[in-house]
């Protein structure tokens, strides 16, 4: 369903209430839930989790639509009711966006979908062996790094943290430059510089296949900006404020779904290294290890009220 279509449906519903003097029926709620709109900031981990959830949703009779939008726009669209689901709420990095959205009452947090992630600056091991082990080591080696830190897409919370460090002149970074790009462009640049053993410092995180593609050293000492334990993070699932009430069956699925580092690393490897389409990768993973399905589908039905677990297993052929 397009955003215009969603707004049109809501307007039509409002007109019906005014003209008929009746409350919205369960059937209207069900129609609103037919298509579930997810956000993807073009992060491969979120592409992966969206695909895993989407394969399940479609087997249950729903349609998934994925919008490629930045994190700031995601929060705006959640608040406006134009995006239903965001499975990439990395905390505490996105705290300011959550605080602003909660003040407006535009989101609901369904809980953690991934524990024990990390998210901070890293360097290749060949740089680390030259003595770069900490944020505090960067400032004295500006020339070797060309005074650049490579980040992801413009406006991303992590980029904002890096820019805040530079603006404050923290750890000797005064005069450095944040290079905005994208996940893919950042890693391509890291690969190019690695070939010549040129120095680079860039944003890194786990889960991600980059941890297998590069011999990385995560930098210590970034607690004031990225948080303790190398930016140790939990990832949460957010929905628009009224979604779980309006669409309780899908809400139950989203509440049930959780991921592991191994699962996400496998998914991202299939997408990045093997060139698989995300939904094909998700189908492959779930067919090869359907053990998560019982927990994910507990209390969940098909769109028309049938046995959800049986429908998903039948669709996957397991």
Regions found by a protein language model. Give the residues of each.
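Bacterial N-terminal signal peptides that target proteins for export
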Residues: 1-14
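Immediate post-signal peptide segment of exported/extracytoplasmic ligand-binding proteins
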Residues: 27-38, 57-58, 140-146, 296, ...
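Short, well-ordered beta-strand elements
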Residues: 31-45, 62-67, 146-150, 254
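An extracytoplasmic/periplasmic, membrane-proximal ligand-sensing/linker region
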Residues: 34-36, 44-45, 164-195, 201, ...
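Ligand-binding cleft/hinge of the Venus flytrap
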Residues: 53-60, 142-177
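Ligand-binding pocket segment of bilobal, Venus flytrap-like solute-binding proteins
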Residues: 76, 83-87, 157-224
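A conserved helix-loop-strand patch within extracytoplasmic ligand-binding domains
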Residues: 106-155
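A bilobed periplasmic-binding-protein/Venus flytrap-type ligand-binding module shared by bacterial periplasmic
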Residues: 118-128, 232-246, 269-270
């Amino acid at each position: 369903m397009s955003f215009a279509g969603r707004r049109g449906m809501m307007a039509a519903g409002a007109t019906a209430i005014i003209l008929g003097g009746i409350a919205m029926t369960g059937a209207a709620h069900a129609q609103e839930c037919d298509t579930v709109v997810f956000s993807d900031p073009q992060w491969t981990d979120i592409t992966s989790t969206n695909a895993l959830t989407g394969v399940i949703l479609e087997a249950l009779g729903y349609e998934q639509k994925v919008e490629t939008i930045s994190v700031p726009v995601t929060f705006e669209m959640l608040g406006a009711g134009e995006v239903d689901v965001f499975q990439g709420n990395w905390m505490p990095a996105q705290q300011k966006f959550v605080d602003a959205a909660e003040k407006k009452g535009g989101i609901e947090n369904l809980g953690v979908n991934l524990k024990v992630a990390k998210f901070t600056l890293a360097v290749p091991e060949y740089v680390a062996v030259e003595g770069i082990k900490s944020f505090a080591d960067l400032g004295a080696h500006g020339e070797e790094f060309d005074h650049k830190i490579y980040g992801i897409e413009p406006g991303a919370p992590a980029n904002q943290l890096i820019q805040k460090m530079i603006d404050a002149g923290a750890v000797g970074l005064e005069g450095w430059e944040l290079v905005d790009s994208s996940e893919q462009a950042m890693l391509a640049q890291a690969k190019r510089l690695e070939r010549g053993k040129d120095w680079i410092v860039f944003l890194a995180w786990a889960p991600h296949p980059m941890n297998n593609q590069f011999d990385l050293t995560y930098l210590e000492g970034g607690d004031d900006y990225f948080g303790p334990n190398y930016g140790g993070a939990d990832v949460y699932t957010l929905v628009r404020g009224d979604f779980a009430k309006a669409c309780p069956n899908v809400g139950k699925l989203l509440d049930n779904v959780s991921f592991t580092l191994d699962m996400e690393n496998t998914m991202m490897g299939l997408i990045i290294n093997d060139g698989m389409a995300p939904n094909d990768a998700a189908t492959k993973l779930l067919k090869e290890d359907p053990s998560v399905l019982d927990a994910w589908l507990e209390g969940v039905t098909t769109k028309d009220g049938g046995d959800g677990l049986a429908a998903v297993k039948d669709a996957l052929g397991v």
